[in-house]
Amino acid sequence: MLNYLTHGAESSPPLMIIHGLYGSGRNWGVIAKRLSNQFYVISVDLRNHGDSPWFASHDYHSMANDLVEVITSLDIRPNIIGHSMGGKAAMVLALKNPDLVNRLLIADIAPVKYEHDQSQFIEAMRKIDLSKVEKRSDATEALSKFVENKSLQNFFTQSLDLKTKSWKLNLDILSSQMHEILGFPKIDGKFSGHTLFFRGEKSEYIRAEHREIINSLFIKARFATLKGAGHWLHAEKPREFENAARLFFKELERF
């Protein structure tokens, strides 16, 4: 079963957080802890990420089935926040198993196939000689030769296990399955629960032309934009993201 971290009282409404590509539940620690005064927060590590098991496949049906296993083991019907790849996994989960999901907040991703590639970051991580890395800043410095964005450098090194000098990412499988990650499966189901598609103002991941397919799958879809934020909106504007999540899950009518 997937690894997950929990915050808050089990008696509170459950909220599952699903990270994006190259991330982990731990990346969401600050937001998860802050939301734990209102929710029982479950932050999962998706397959081939963090402390969860590694598998030879990385498709959205498999990821959704992994999430079903966690949800049923906890006997909950959670609200869900899913970012990027995690948002796609959350959408597939809701479309295939609508009775298991309460409300969805999909952060900066649409149920469509994207043409851009994220494999360059895998190659960057592969180029790091981890035998010479003694502290996280060593890896950050080494990554800076291949990844210009400082925030991304720090983000990637959060998935570095210093004790074993290895990545907590199944880079080989993520590379070979990149076509699955960038795509989105055809699903006949619909989700009639409240769903917020929350985009970063500076991001192009949720575009106007995506609304037709979104509305056809998510009957109660709503849209909001976080001003000044890009694709990593929860990291760039954490307080604003947190406040929007609270409003959506507790006071939906404001949207």
For each of these PLM feature ranges, what is it?
Residues 131-187:
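Conserved alpha/beta-hydrolase catalytic His-Asp/Glu region
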